[in-house]
Design a protein with these regions (language model features):
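Short acidic, glycine/proline-enriched helix-loop-strand junctions
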Residues: 44-63, 123, 139, 264-267
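N-terminal substrate-binding region of glycoside hydrolase catalytic domains
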Residues: 25-44, 64-68
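Active-site acidic/histidine proton-transfer and metal-coordination neighborhood
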Residues: 75-176, 186, 268-272, 295
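Glycine-rich, proline-tolerant flexible connector loops at the mouths of alpha/beta enzymes
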Residues: 35-54, 110, 114-115, 150-151
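Histidine-acidic metal/acid-base catalytic patches
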Residues: 1-30, 54, 94, 100-102, ...
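N-terminal small/glycine-rich loop or linker at the start of catalytic domains
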Residues: 1-10, 62-75, 109-110
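Conserved beta-strand positions in the central sheet of alpha/beta enzyme cores
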Residues: 35, 62-64, 105, 142, ...
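Active-site-proximal loop/turn and secondary-structure-junction residues that shape catalytic pockets
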Residues: 13-15, 38-40, 66-69, 108-112, ...
């Protein structure tokens, strides 16, 4: 795959805007896809949102249910009861499937007060249920693992190897992966090798970069502005056969979450962020082609 990479925007990282505004930002930045957050539907139905995307020439990419984790978290919407959460997630999958997205995102959520083994077991059972609902709706899932250094509010699964093990435990090794660059950077000494090996299982790459040192979980950078080594990652993805979307998702606290970083990316206009994200992707992509040529790959 040497054609230009497919670029999309994730609505989770556009917290102040409407779907209409996000569509304008996507088109203005050169993106051809948008990962819709069900939480932004408001009083619109899925068919309304699908029509808006179609009119703008945008593909629905890795869409996000209003409840996106199996286990409850203070940072993630939804009830405390796991069964109720999973039921709402299944409803979200059915609604989002009407957009014909490339996939729908899910994650475990944190263990909370549950013993770690019990939390993992409950999450695996929930994933199995959600995957069945996704099968019925005709849409793939993308399962996201998290960064081990900041696990308490989002996940019980950390890194690519743990993610594939978890999916096997759930009896659904066919479920695809969400590859978040910020979360996976530094997760394994074999990251590039694993990226190449698992590329066929990756549905979407969440595009961002890593500040070093990272101050908090919401201190991410636009692609090309950090130390993640995007060209090597992109080369490995391409060599492994990945042909999916690069979905811009940069969380950078401007004060709303308690860390008012003076250099927060979120202090930039949303359209400027999206344009710079696209430019950074293309620069790193071209560098990855040059890297592969030097390596003879």
């Amino acid at each position: 795959m040497t054609q230009a990479p497919k670029y999309s925007l994730c609505e989770l990282a556009l917290p102040d805007t409407t779907i209409e505004q996000d569509i304008e930002i996507a088109v203005g930045s050169g993106a051809t896809g948008l990962s819709i957050d069900e939480g932004k539907f408001g009083d619109r139905g899925p068919q309304d949102v699908a029509a808006m995307l179609s009119a703008a020439g945008l593909q629905a990419v890795a869409c996000i249910p209003a409840v996106m984790s199996f286990l409850p978290s203070r940072r993630i919407n939804g009830p405390d009861d796991i069964g109720e959460r999973v039921a709402l997630m299944c409803e979200g999958v059915r609604r989002l499937a009407e957009l014909r997205p490339t996939s729908i995102l899910c994650l475990t959520g944190p263990a909370g007060e549950l013993p770690s083994a019990e939390a993992r077991k409950r999450a695996a059972e929930a994933l199995h249920t959600l995957a069945a609902a996704a099968d019925e709706a005709g849409v793939p899932l993308s399962f996201e693992s998290f960064r081990y250094t900041d696990p308490n509010d989002y996940s019980v699964v950390f890194g690519l190897e743990d993610a594939t093990a978890f999916l096997a435990e759930a009896g659904r090794p066919d479920v695809g992966l969400c590859y978040d660059i910020w979360h996976l950077w530094g997760s394994s000494e074999r990251l590039i090798e694993l990226t190449r090996e698992l590329a066929p299982r990756i549905n979407v790459v969440q595009l961002n970069d890593v500040r070093e040192p990272t101050r908090t979980w919401d201190d991410r950078l636009l692609p090309g502005d950090g130390v993640a080594g995007l060209p090597a990652i992109f080369a490995a993805l391409r060599q492994g056969g990945f042909d999916g979307w690069f979905d811009l998702e940069v969380f950078s606290d401007d004060g709303r979450w308690g860390h008012e970083f003076p250099d927060s990316v979120w202090k930039l206009p949303w359209l400027e962020q999206a344009r710079r994200g696209h430019e950074g992707l293309l620069r790193a992509w071209n560098e990855s082609l040059q890297l592969a040529a030097r390596q003879g790959a």
